[in-house]
């Protein structure tokens, strides 16, 4: 990607825990052909049943060469089966709603740099006879209006 006359390339490295879940992703960036260098990272925390319950985002402070936490997302779940469980692939696709075994009911985003960007999303489901979501309503606190979702199964 070219930005302001410079060419940027990026790369991601994934670390896995003993359960085979992605526990960390590290972003590396190369500018104008320079060697790849650390840029940012995310850490993932799971519950005992495999639900992704925490997501911590960090950036690299180039002055100290230490990671500084910038965000913290807490995720809550129901006890019903998630209709699409992608596991690690959900993280690669940045679809954290499809990483876990159960359905997200609430996601609380804490922006540690600017609390004005904090957000809460709540999910309300109507389930079919197989205990999978038939419809959902997602409400973001900042917007206040429910967003309808319909699930289709084959």
Which residues does each predicted region cover?
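Buried hydrophobic residues that stabilize the cores of well-folded domains
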Residues: 1-154
């Amino acid at each position: 990607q070219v930005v302001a006359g410079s060419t940027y390339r990026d790369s991601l490295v994934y670390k896995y825990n003993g359960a085979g879940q992605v526990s960390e992703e590290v972003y590396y960036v190369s500018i104008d052909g320079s060697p790849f260098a650390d840029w940012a990272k995310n850490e993932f925390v799971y519950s005992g049943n495999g639900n992704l319950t925490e997501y911590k985002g960090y950036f690299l402070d180039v002055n100290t060469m230490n990671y500084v936490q910038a965000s913290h997302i807490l995720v809550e779940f129901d006890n019903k089966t998630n209709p699409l469980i992608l596991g690690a692939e959900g993280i690669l696709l940045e679809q954290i709603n499809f990483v876990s075994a159960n359905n997200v009911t609430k996601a609380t985003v804490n922006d540690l740099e600017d609390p004005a960007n904090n957000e809460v999303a709540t999910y309300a489901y109507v389930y079919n006879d197989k205990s999978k979501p038939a419809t959902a309503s997602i409400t973001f606190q900042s917007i206040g209006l429910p967003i309808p979702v319909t699930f289709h199964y084959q």
